[in-house]
């Protein structure tokens, strides 16, 4: 039987809590478990009663204080009921024996060694005596969200070195286009290394593929010094199978989260789900989401989030009826208002962007509540650039939707949409000697579309290299596969003119 004991301090959070320079208190939310031990570098990975965790009187939270630590990194896991070994779901760094071998050590110079021979699987890491990053531009804030010009980028397909330090070197190029915000595709720990990042496993950790946490902080800090906000693409609709939230409560017979999983639905509530669907009406999930968002906004000083698949934050079951999924859902609105209110308790200026694509009556409510809403104008603008009839009003003009607030983040391209120039060159219209399939003509068509696009009031977003007429198909090398990095486009005078 576990020792029943109240938490020693009232302000402890799930995960690692540092107590001075030699101790940590570990907390794990794990209701309905019988016993949990901690194993790690600090006890040579031995299963010992000295490292049995205490259970709080409400029987929901397990905790232990580990003393006698030195100023260094320690790997550890939780051994649950003698059957499940998992990394801390709130870990800020994990070691992966299957994928870390392909992490470039020049990008992540201080990666701790995996405890080979002591354990197996993914392990979590904490570091005692870690030096705080010396922020220089903490006073930065977004002054006017409706004037955002956002540059969406995926580090893997933007720079060959795939690291934050080289990304810093591109800021003059990005800033020269009038960009005042960068939206990073997901950089939280995801499964594998080569990915868009929408397959998250540890939502509090920086994925090691692009560098360590201080390198990310330096990138954000320097962006702020240049007057550029940094927005994080946040994936909280779901988790993938390596997540400890999945593994702690798993139905092996049906290969899905168990019915008593505190965070995840056994079966997703909508047809567009990927991975395993979070139940955002669960108090466990709400607590988790609140801590994750606070971590990224305060520890890394991100300026806001673009929430992936925000329409999925509902327990309304619409499987088999995609149309019903998009209809006005007051329970979903309530979830988003709760998340917003929790953020506003400590950050009044964070920009909250929803990839929602719900019916207009719901998006109008959310816009009025201060959310920015993605507005996909790809089809309409691409029809125009190809030389066909098109109505440009709905995708990019908030007033056409009956909104009072300029909170529509419109875009002609995104990571999810086909590239304008690809379709211009493949399917462009013609009239006599005038053909949109001609490269320079196609570029001129995109230039004309841009002149219209950027004059419509409200925030705007462009996709990386779209300013140079990137013309590789979105499905080149597979939809989420690596794409050619085309800085050489700058050598083409007509492409360079477009930007």
Residue ranges and their predicted role:
Residues 198-201, 475-487:
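Active-site His/acidic residue clusters
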Residues 18-20, 27-71, 81-104:
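Aromatic-rich carbohydrate-binding modules that target alpha-glucans
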Residues 33, 71, 155-158, 189, ...:
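Short, solvent-exposed loop/turn segments at secondary-structure junctions
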Residues 78, 457, 485-499:
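Aromatic- and carboxylate-lined catalytic core of secreted/periplasmic carbohydrate-active enzymes
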Residues 94-103, 107-119, 131-148, 154-328, ...:
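Substrate-binding/active-site clefts of carbohydrate-active enzymes
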Residues 102, 301-303, 318, 323, ...:
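Conserved alpha/beta catalytic core and glycan-binding cleft of carbohydrate-active enzymes
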Residues 73-75:
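Short, conserved beta-strand segments of beta-strand-rich sandwich/propeller modules, principally
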Residues 1-34, 112-115:
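Non-catalytic, glycine-rich low-complexity segments
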